Amino acid sequence: KVITDKMPLNFRYIGFILSAFPEAKIIHLKRDARATCWSIYKHYFSSKGNGFSYDQNDLAAFYHLYTELMTFWHQQFPDKIYDLCYEDLTTNQEEETRQLLDYCNLDWDKNCLNFHTNKRAVKTASALQVRQKMYQGSSEAWRQYEDHLQPLINALKPVS
């Protein structure tokens, strides 16, 4: 059985998930830190617990905590977490998707490249993106606001 949940704060629960589901495999989608933080910063989250996302310094501090926790999870569960680079996925979609499916012990299906044509209901902050083909360049969108993001960029420098 395959279950997916892409909530951005799920990284906090990897230990619980793998304890409850020892056969689970975690897919960790890594992306440029500035692109990740910009994506969070520009979005309004209606749920509580996301106040860090509205302050550039708080967001950078949270991002550093995230990277530290992911390092810890990798040490604790070295064979259970698959790192997938977002930028690689957007430039080499088929190759990266095949490697991911191989890790998950799932068969290749050409429809993996046509995910945007799926008609099922999707409830996510990025619902519109789910209906689009994969495209390159979104990891550079933050550059349009670079002058206004200096506190964030400076605070991220050790990991950017």
Model-identified regions with their sequence ranges:
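Conserved phosphate-donor/acceptor-positioning beta-strand/loop module used by diverse small-molecule
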Residues: 17-42
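Hydrophobic/aromatic-lined pockets within catalytic cores
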Residues: 12, 22, 105
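PAPS-dependent sulfotransferases, especially Golgi type II membrane carbohydrate sulfotransferases
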Residues: 1-2, 40-83, 91-160
